[in-house]
Amino acid sequence: MQKRYLGKSGLEVSALGLGCMGLSHGYGPATDTRQAIELIRAAVERGVTFFDTAEVYGPYLNEEVVGEALKPFRDRVVIATKFGFTFGDDNKQQILNSRPEHIREAVEGSLRRLKTDVIDLLYQHRVDPDVPIEDVAGTVKDLIAEGKVKHFGLSEAGAQTIRRAHAVQPVTALQSEYSMWRREPEQEILPLLEELGIGFVPFSPLGKGFLTGAIKPGTTFGKDDYRSTVPRFAAQAIEANEKLVTLLGKLAAEKGVTSAQIALAWLLAQKPWIVPIPGTTKLNRLEENLAAADIVLSQKDTQQITEALETIKIVGERYSPEHQARVGR
């Protein structure tokens, strides 16, 4: 597996990471713990060194699974996790909380669940409008000085927030959704990250499964699958967006690869400091995704794909109104 540096931070990771959320959270019932551990370890064996989790996934369960899976390989991998919420009595209600004392409490819990003495990359999961970002960055700066955290990251933050945070504690990586069907980061965020030397970690690089071609207008999602609340996964939106799936299929056929592989290869070709983190619960999909790192798209290929994407209008918001209000702050 090829390696990449996240911006100018010196943090080196595999060109593709593994987003672990879906093993425990968000896409239906949690995967059997033993199977989840085996999948994560299979990723390590195939050269993946970058693993993404968060306390909110489960909540807590995903960190426990990741910690158990990676314990034998701790010195070979980079573990990223996130803070930023407190939870209601039922552990379902998520309340934004990035107060300094809560960040410290969250870090202690994450260290325990991840079975480690240091968090390689700690993200603020969502910007908390009630806590100045300078206070957040300052707290993480202190945690880095104390040896409990190595690198600071932000997730779904807006440009001004990134600048303000970076002025207090250098930001190693921004994690936000970026893919062929969510290209807004190209407008303002990518130029800013390049200017500041910050790496970019796209989550949902396969459009939460849509770009693989597996989701059709008749596809239904259970109540425990958060796509059931997302406007972009309503039947009418899926039907309208099938033009993108058709285009991907055509491009993939021309290269003799899969739609998922083209989608990932296109992302990797955008910038050398971009590290997508596709998730999966299946070994064959893991291997398919990782093979995308070996696909070389020429500048001409990338330009032609991008020009084709410009002709397609994506229908539907990517979040419910409640969750949409929490991004880009």
Q: What does each model-identified segment do?
A:
Residues A30-Q35, L61, V65, Q94-H102, ...:
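Alpha-helix N-cap and loop-to-helix initiation/capping positions
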Residues G67-V78, R112-K115, I144, H166-Q169:
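Acidic (Asp/Glu)-rich catalytic clusters
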Residues M1-V78:
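N-terminal binding-site loop/beta-alpha segment at the start of enzyme catalytic domains
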Residues L18-C20, T53, L121-Q124, L154, ...:
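Conserved beta-strand positions
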Residues A30-A43, S98-L114, G158-R163:
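Short, acidic/polar
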Residues G22-Y27, T86-Q93, R285-E288:
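A short acidic, helix-capping loop that chelates divalent metal ions and anchors anionic groups
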